[in-house]
Amino acid sequence: MPPPYDPANPSGPNERRRAFRLLFLCLMATGIGNSMLFAILPPLARDLGVAEAWVGAIYTTSALLFLFMSPVWGALSDRYGRRPLIMFGLSCFALSTLIFAAAAWAGESGLAPPLIAIFAMAVSRTLFGGLGSATNPSAQAYVADRTSPAERTEALAGLTAAFGMGAILGPALAAAFVERIGVAPFMIAIAVLVGACAVAVRLMLPEKTPPRQQARPINPLRQFAFALDRRLAPFVIFGAGYWMIQASSLTVIGFFLMNRLALDPQQGLQFSGVALMAGAGALIFAQLVVIPALKASPRVLMGLGAGMAVLGNVEMLFAANYAAIVFGYVMLSFGFGLARSGFTGGASLAVGPDEQGRAAGVTTATAGLGFAIAPVGALYLFQTFGDITPYLVSAVLAAGLLALAFLHPRIRKASDIAKVTPEPRSPV
């Protein structure tokens, strides 16, 4: 939600509102592009005769680069400004989607052996992880620059809800159109959409605030080490752990449904698309309705989210039919909506104005860490020890995060900062 008028901010609320709406649309487009893969890849892999572990490798390849590069892009946005980095990330995302579409077409048409097609898909996701990862930390820092401490958690919740909105549309669009037009044409359309967003950012996103820290040297290892700063460390640990839970559930859900309900690949696409859409709807409801109504501190949001993750994973352990599986996944997604807004808002509040880009990069990198570990690990557990094992491990991890949220003093301290009087905001 854009902040009210502040005489210290000459841009006024209307210009900020338009800027935030544009960022919302851009992140929603990238959310569509990312979430559709969780509906498309499991049935595509089975059509190509590729083992589940190779699907996990695609996610992990992208996630490793996302993990290491997000802090760098966040720091670069402090140096060169938010808008150029947002535009660059969107452009690279569009290009990576085009490459993925070509690889999928080559694999399905028989022009490339299945493992070569999977390798090309992994290369495309490498481009996204390394370069497309510039968008999220830069957009998050853009919003943090223009909101007070008291407003920031809610404002960042609205921004991250954009990605969740895309997560609703991605599986739904995939389920509706992939069977009709094919994987490659559908992904080309998504690439065009994201490319149009990059053009819109170049032409329409205002940025009057000069970059801070222009003399700071960008050392990738130093930016990554910023995660160990004692102000940020508890939020980074919580975020990485929660992203592992989320990445595990996203990776496994398609295979879990096909196993439990004895579905063929086409049915798996339809059923998983509906489940993913329902979960994303719960995430959006948490971020756009529940969080503004609660006006809770980051600590409370983190605790509530972790508690929901415990309940959701336990539900999946005993789910006996499609409705029960969807219900468990909805609980997991609702909890993630609360927790993600809590740890991103808390990390932003824990540091000063000149460190917002770096903090945004570090918290964004937790997604990369989660997806670097969880997909391969979850699918290994799935194949080796049974389909409920990933949910059992996630339930234990969520219980640990629940304790961290309520017991760590740094999380409590950052939550107290949100109660101070709003500070003047910088111009757009």
Task: Name each model feature, range by range.
Residues 39-53, 251-271:
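Short amphipathic helix-loop junctions that connect adjacent transmembrane helices
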Residues 298-343:
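C-terminal transmembrane helical hairpin of 12-TM major facilitator-type secondary transporters
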Residues 124-163:
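Cytoplasmic helix-loop-helix junction between adjacent transmembrane helices
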Residues 2-17, 206-236, 423-428:
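Juxtamembrane intracellular "pre-TM" segments in multi-pass secondary transporters
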Residues 67-108:
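Conserved MFS/SLC helix-loop-helix module at the cytosolic interface between two early adjacent transmembrane helices
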Residues 91-114, 308-320:
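C-terminal ends and interior cores of transmembrane alpha-helices
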Residues 66-68, 271-294:
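Transmembrane alpha-helices of Major Facilitator/SLC transporters
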Residues 28, 110-134, 324-338:
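Hydrophobic core of transmembrane alpha-helices in multi-pass small-molecule transporters
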